[in-house]
Every structure is written in structure tokens, then in C-alpha cells.
Amino acid sequence: MLDTWFSSALVPFSTLINDPKAFDIYLPSSVLVTGYDILFFWVARMVMMTRFFTGRVPFKNVYIHGLVRDAEGNKMSKSEGNTLDPLDIIQGVDLESLVKKNTTGLRQPEKAPIVEKKLRKHYPEGINEIGADALRFTMAAYATLGRNVNFDVKRADGYRNFCNKLWNATRFVLMNVEGKDCGLDPNAPMEYSAPDQWIWSEFERTVQEVRKAFEDYRLDNAANAIYSFIWNQYCDWYLELSKVQLNQGNEAVQRATRHTLVTVLEQTLRLAHPIIPFITEELWQKVSVVAGVRSEDSVDSLMVQSYPVYDPAKVNTQADITVNELKAMVDAIRNLRSGMLVPPSKKVPLAVSSRDGEARARAEKLTPYLQTLGRLEEVIFTDDLETVRPVGSAAPVAVVDDFSLMLIIKVDVAAERERLSKEIARLENEIAKANNKLSNENFVKKAPAKVIEQERSRLANNEQLLASNKEQLAKLPQA
């Protein structure tokens, strides 16, 4: 009878000895995936055995990942009752079934009440159905250079939301492009806007980043780049900008918008497929037909399509500048509305001034986007904001690059001063309490690192809000 590690050390070549063709193809293999805890027991022995018997190395690269631990950093062990069955995460499990599974077969049965208490604390409603793709994405995002992975189901919940976001984005695109002219006729006129060109630039940069991440075995970087592009750029910005173009653009603009929507999405599904294969395959089967990639009756799979390759020709620097200005202006408008407590349903006028003629010309072309995303009644361009400021108004001004922005609203100075003073007092009180906590040695010693980090983050956020409120108060005219 052979020792476990001895027989395991023979794996790279033992099944290939009688097949010379397979021997030449598969030895050495490209990469071995393993954990650092068995480097000596298995990896080193495979190298030694394979070199001794064949004169070759067993594999070209070794990808070493961290050990998966529970949310508190303890090593997962069935006998300790802190393991999680991947199927329970994928399919979901109720609390009682989870407790029963994790308190059965414990190495120390007397610990069952402790295990049960922890489970009921961490999973009071059991585990929601996460799905296979969301779990895969979670593990890819966790694959950092660290030696340990403290697995938290809440993070997997976040990636389930990401998969839902991709699904809903695809529904929106199909709803707006199916049965319509998507620019598949090369002779049809198309007018690509700055947002159309910008989203292609963002996609190409993401392709470059993801491919490099895969080449470097940085699955976390690949997952984060895909997440950022889909959620932050494509969904949060381009889909919203495309609505303006579909509603207000001429026929050529609408055609170009539909073409951009569906082609960028089709390529994005290819990009994300290695990490989330099931949802991307399902969506691609519909998107690829509309994008003209395959016919409706074909049985092609996304799995065998070519992977996106970086194309620098699609990176448009001028479009990037224009859209980044637009995004900054929209963010500033939203901050102004929030700071002045303007209800989301209320449309108000905006005044914009700039001394740069070229910048002003660019901004004037962005008016439809500003009105829609900023929920504005109109956009007024002026050389001096004071000429359009309502008499006695204390409306604040936001500065974005070469632009000054002001909502044309009459503000009750006395009421605004009172509101800001109360908010400043509240924030100062919160900051004082946080500083007392963090200066308490007992708290810092005994509190979990996560709690301390949350307290520091809350303190930094409140300090930032305090500075902003004081700045607004200082800008109010004196009575």
C-alpha cells in the first residue's frame, strides 16, 4: 500500500506512460492550482518524482491561492462546525437545516450549543440563494495575494446583486433594440455621440486590464475590473446617457446608440464569461442574435467565441474628456440639489458660467444630458452667475474644472443658517464621541479590527461632512 503523498506525487505522469502522444501533449501541463499548506507534501514531491522518472518538470507554473477561512478568520473544519457547503450558498438553506448540518459529526459534541449559537447569530434567516455565478465571482474577487480568505456570505450577496444588475441591464438593452434598426447595415448612416465613443474607450481599457490580470494570475483584479466597468460605467452612466439619445436624437443618432448598446454588451458578456459562465451564456444567446453575431437557429455557444482583444484605435481621448466633464457636472448638480434639500421630483433651472469659450461650447452640446440626469427645468449659460441669481438668494456655487454651476433657487438665508448650524453641532458631537472611543485603549485592544475600522471610517466621513457644512455656512450672506 502506497503512502497518500507518494501516490499523489506520481499523478503528473502515471496516467500518461502508456500513451506517448498524450505524454508529449500534457507533460508538462500549463499550471497547477493549489494551496500553500501542501507545497512540500505534494507540489515539491511531484516535481522531484517527475524529474526523476521522466527528466521533465510536471508543470510550467504553480498558482498558489490562500486558505478559505470563516468570517472570523478561523480555519474551516467540519469537526468544528464552521464550514459552509457551497451548495447551500448556491441554492440557499434555511436556518434549522444549516444548524442541523453543522452540529452533526462534531469532534467535540459538547460544543454543539456554541456552534448553534454562532450560526443563529451570523445567519438568523439562513442563507439566501446566491447562485453559482455569484459564488464564483466572489471567490475570484477574494483571490488576492494574501495567505487567507475570510469568507463572508454578505459579500457573496453583493455579487448576486451584481449578477442581477447585468441581467436587468440586458433586459433594458433588448427592450430598446429588438426588432429595431441596430446599425447592422454598413451603409446606414450613424452618428456616434461622445458617450458612445467614451463607452468603447472604457471597454477597451477594461479588456486590457482584464487580459493582463489573467496573464498575471490576478483573478481578483480581473473580477474587480469587470465589476467596475459593468456597474459603474455601462449601467450607471452609459445606459442613462443612452436614454437621452434614444428619446431626443435623430434617426442616425438613435441607430448608433442601439448599435453601441448591443455590441458593447455582447463583447462584455464575452469578457465576463470565464468568471460567470452561466448567466453570460444565457444572456449571450439572445444578445448575439440582435448584435448580428449569430443566426437565431444556430447552436453556437459563447464558450467557443473569441475572447476580446485590446484595440487602441477605439480609445477616443476627446470623448473621454467630454464625458468626464459631463459626469463631474452631473455629480455637482446632484450635490447642489442634495445640499439645498431640493426634492428629486422638482425640476429647477441651472446657471452655468465659463470663461473658456471652447469649454462652454462643449457644455452647451451636453445640455440635454444635464437636463435629464440633473432633473433640470432648463440650463442657462451666462458670463456672470450674479446676473441670474435671485435677489437675496444664498444659493451655493459649485466649481467643476472651467465651469461654475448654480441652481437658480431663492434660499431663505435665516432658515438655511439655522439648518446648517444644527447639522454642524450634530456632527461635532458625533466626532467627539468617535474620538473618545478611538482614544480609549481598552476599546482599541478589545474591539474587533472590523469594528475599529468602521469607527475610523465613520469619523473620517463625519469630518468631511463637517468641513463641507462649515464652508456652506461661511458662504451665506451676513444678515
Residue ranges and their predicted role:
Residues P28-I38:
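The substrate-binding groove and active-site-proximal loops of carbohydrate-active enzymes
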Residues R147-R155:
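Short, solvent-exposed helix-loop connector elements
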Residues D19-F23:
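Extracellular beta-rich ligand/substrate-recognition surface
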Residues M1-W5, L10, F52-A132, K154-A479:
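Feature 926 captures the class I aminoacyl-tRNA synthetase adenylation module centered on the KMSKS loop
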Residues L145-G146, Y217:
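A conserved hydrophobic secondary-structure block that centers on an alpha-helix together
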Residues Y36-L39, D94, I127-N128, A134-A140:
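Aromatic-rich carbohydrate-recognition surfaces in CAZymes
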